Each structure stands twice: as structure tokens, then as C-alpha cells.
């Protein structure tokens, strides 16, 4: 029931009224975070701040635990993760943010690759569990601190701090979910069909994709492959021929083959969604 409530609240959060960028530039003018804020990110993941011409956006004002958690849940859902509970509608201290964010990231598999020492001198009142979660955030460059030696754990989290922190979380999630691959080759033909073929070898998975184009002259490559909830999504970079270039009106096919290392993938079956193809083919 909690998970359903969370999903409903995120849907409401994303369906807030029309968003414009009218006043955010004014409110960030001269602010230390001006160059760090991605306006599109704010509009998408913090729509309650962007609503009505960013009327609720005040960089140095505090953000509630519920608003922060809803934005975090919305971000997680974009990477096929989820969690229950949306927090309390009260102030959120920086150490409580560490507890909430660190525990959620730990649950989805983020870990400390190096046991780097935390430099902050004002964390002696934090529990040992919270300090380990802080280490996780610090090691992954999600939380840097008020200064090189100060975290200010008891201070309430501000709107602009929440935005910057979740922007860094997005970068971490992107890295966690990106699958490295090797392009083996691409060929063009005039007699084929759109399809996706998956072949398993001892240590590798070979994926062959064929896409139809209305004329020759198109280029096709894979931009990235991302892990999803029950498989992987392949994102393509497709460029049409130059508009002033004469092309015969002949249907052509591009067949692209990529290689993925099994040890970087989850357990089979290997399900792939082709971005733009609207189909899923599994092995």
C-alpha cells in the first residue's frame, strides 16, 4: 500500500501545472550555485518548486523531508528503482538527508570502492551507521560538505543543496546502469527485415540489430546501453542524410552487431528494449 501511495504522489508531482523558466534566472542571479543548477533538472524532478513560474523556488529556503524524498523517488523510478515511504512533511536536516539518501543508494547496490577517510570534523554526534552512509556519499562525490572540514549535520537542507545533491545522484545512477559494449561491425543491405538476435557465447553476449530506413544515407550507432528493471535498453544515435543530398527512394537496412561481457550483465534471460523500435525480444 505504501508503494502504491508513493507512486500516486510521484504522478501528482509530475503532473503539476505548466512550467516556465521565467524567474529562476532572477532568483539564482549572483547566487553561489547559479552555474551548478540544471534548469531542466529542476523542472522535471522538482516541479513543485517550478510550478507557477518558480514561485516556490527560493534557493536558501529549507526543503521538507517529503519533498526531497518524492524527488528522490521520481529520480529512482527513471532508473527502474523504487522504494516505499515518502517521508514526513517537516524539516530535513543534513544528517537525516545522509541517512535517507545513503540507505536508499546502499539498498540498490552502490558501495564504497575505496575506504577514503572522511575529512569532516563536526560529525562526532552522528551514529556509526550514519557515518558509514556519509562515507558512501562522500566517496561517490555526492556530498562534499559545507567546506573541506565541515558538514554542518544539524543544519537544515536547503532547496538549492537538495537540487545539486540529486543532480550528482543522477550521474551516479547513470554510471551504475550503463553497460559497456564493443561494436563489432555494421553492414548495409537491401533485402532484410527489422529484427534483434541474441546469441550467447561462453563469456559474451552478441546482440545483432537490423533496422529499416526509407533511403540510403542514414548512419546508425549505439549511444548507450542501460540496465532496466527486467533487462536492458539500447539507445540509438541515428542521423538522416543531408537534406540537399539526392538519394534513391530505396528501402535499406542497417545491421549492427555489438558484444557485451557476461560478467557485466545480470543473470539471464537477456531482455532488450530497442529505443525507437517499440518492441522487446528476449533470448
Question: What are these model-predicted stretches?
Answer:
Residues 71, 146, 237-239:
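Active-site-proximal beta-strand/loop segments in catalytic clefts of secreted hydrolases
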Residues 21-23, 34-35, 41-42, 109-119, ...:
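Exposed, flexible binding/inhibitory loops of compact, secreted disulfide-stabilized domains
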Residues 4-38, 46-66, 73-131, 144-159, ...:
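Feature responds to low-complexity, polar/acidic, surface-exposed segments characteristic
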